[in-house]
Regions:
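Canonical positions in the second alpha-helix
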Residues: 9-10, 43-44, 78
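Residue at a conserved register position within TPR or TPR-like alpha-solenoid repeats
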Residues: 28, 62, 95-98, 102
Length: 102
């Protein structure tokens, strides 16, 4: 069974499994299926808005899809989330990416 199928099996049993949803989004991104990846990140972040790795990777995926304005918005939201949760490492990574995007 491939990773996408395995992750979908997990999500069938528990649709709010944060790690499986994140993994599925990352697998789609790795395969270049950015639309499906972003759809999975959207589901993930609706259920877990303060999941900063999801914010950061969604922003990177948006940037890869040349959706720079959306990536900046995601980073701004992710930075606020990182501040709320005290995740200084994620905050600094997202601030650096935001500065890089201009």
């Amino acid at each position: 069974m491939d990773r996408i199928a395995a992750l979908n099996d997990i999500l069938t049993q528990n649709p709010n499994d944060t790690f499986a949803r994140y993994g599925l989004a990352m697998e789609y991104s790795k395969q270049g299926d950015l639309d499906r990846s972003l759809a999975e990140f959207s589901i993930l972040l609706k259920a877990n808005p303060d999941y900063t790795p999801g914010c950061f990777m969604a922003a990177q995926t948006l940037a890869r899809a040349d959706r720079i304005a959306d990536a900046k918005t995601m980073l701004t939201d992710g930075i606020a989330s990182a501040r709320r949760t005290g995740n200084l490492h994620a905050q600094s990574e997202m601030e650096a990416m935001l500065a890089e995007l201009g």
